[in-house]
Every structure is written in structure tokens, then in C-alpha cells.
Amino acid sequence: MVQAVWHTVQDAGWKNIKINEEDFKKISGLRKKGGFAELADSPKFYLWQGEKKFIIKTDSYRKNLKRKERCVRMIEDILKYNKEFVEKKAYEPYLTSKYPDKKLAILTCMDTRLTELLPAALGIKNGDAKIIKNAGGVITHPYGSVMRSLLVGILELGVEEIMVIGHTDCGVQGMDGHHMLEELVERGVSQEHINVIKSTGTDLEKWLGGFESVEQSVKDTVYALKHHPLMPTGIKITGFIMDSVTGGLEAVEEKK
């Protein structure tokens, strides 16, 4: 049975194969992991159990796996690594205080390309700066979590300078809020809930939408920070665009 399933999956490239409960019981080398069942002799293939039907999928096509399956495996890997990290005391090089040594806060994008590139390109080490990230590195609300975090950094942690850093090839540039709402409905969000939120005056399309120009977005964010009624005097605020490949920085002129 395992062999037959193996060949069917290999021939199809990627395919859901429903197996009834009786056939499932006949499969040897099976081990259960929570709500999942895994083929011990074929680690690339595993079964997902649901309503007395079992679906076999290939791990080489991760994008096609059910999100729940991917998350379970990913979290297991993370927890395993974390345990080893602590046991080996690999945390010791990162020991520092909560106060940024450079008295610097950076507002930037959550783009994965910047995770290691940005601090490396700026010479920022653990403990040097407060780094605040969101989609696009922008302020979507004058009294939202980004502004609050920056004020906490200034008032409680000694931040004296803020760098706003956008980057080239940003995924938020040109993002369509209307399309995102359609996708939310496809992903199971109730249209009724969306309509209720809109009825309160919330512009969800604008909230979910992106910007047309990275440079203009950085200018607008710097301007919003400098003219925010709660921004203390004496805080230096500057804007930059980072090359998402080389890490090179280009200063952005202040909005007039």
C-alpha cells in the first residue's frame, strides 16, 4: 500500500490521494504526531487525518501543503532549535541591556530581505538600537502602535534620534486594498463583518492599501513624526531608502 501511494504521488508530482479508513490501517511504518500521521519510512511524505479520510502529500511542494500542517512542522523545528540554543548557551554573545547604546530608533519595513541586511549594513549590533518594523515602515495611524513605540523609546529608553528607512522593491508599493479585501473573503472572513467595519467609517481599502512611491512614503512618514503633537523637541528625525540588494543608503530630502 505504501509503495502504491509512493508511485502515485511521484507520477503525479503533487496530488491529494484519499485513502479510506480500512486502507489506512494497513499502512505499515506509520507513526502519529498529534492530529497528524507520518510515514516513518518515507519522511518526505506524510498523512493528514480528517473525517476518516487520509490525504498523502509531498513535502517538496510546501506551498501546496495545508497551512496547519506547515505550521505544525515549522513550530516543532523552531522549538527543537530553541531548546538546543539555550542548552548550548548560544545566547551569551547577545547579552545586553534594554537601553539602546546608540540612543537610536529605526522605523523600517518587515521585509525578510532586511532581517540581517539592515543591521549589518548600518553596523548595528545587538543592544545598539530599537528597531520597529511593519509593512512598509509607515505610520498608518497617528496614535497607533508605531507612534506609541517610538514615544516609549524616547521617554523611557533614552532614544534621541529616529531613522525612517524605506527600501527598494518594497512589496507594499502598489498594494491594492480592494484586492486584499476580496482575498480575505476567499480566506473565510465574513463579508458581513467587513461591511460592519466599513459602516463605522473605517476605510479598509485605504488601511490595507499601499503607497505609490517609496520616496514619497518616507517623506510623509518623516513629516508626520516631526509634526506630531506629542513628539518631544530635540529629537533628530531623518529619512532614507535602502537598496534591498546591496544595503546602500540614500538620504531622502525632507518634505517641504
List each language-model region with its residue ranges.
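Short polybasic linear motifs
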Residues: 8, 42
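Short, Lys/Arg-enriched N-terminal segments with co-localized hydrophobic residues
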Residues: 59-73
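Divalent-metal-activated hydrolytic enzyme cores
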Residues: 72-102, 137-142, 157, 172-256
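Conserved beta-strand-loop surface patch within small alpha/beta domains used
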Residues: 88, 93-147
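Divalent metal-coordination and catalytic microenvironments
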Residues: 106, 164, 247
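Ordered, amphipathic secondary-structure segments that act as subunit-interaction surfaces
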Residues: 155-167
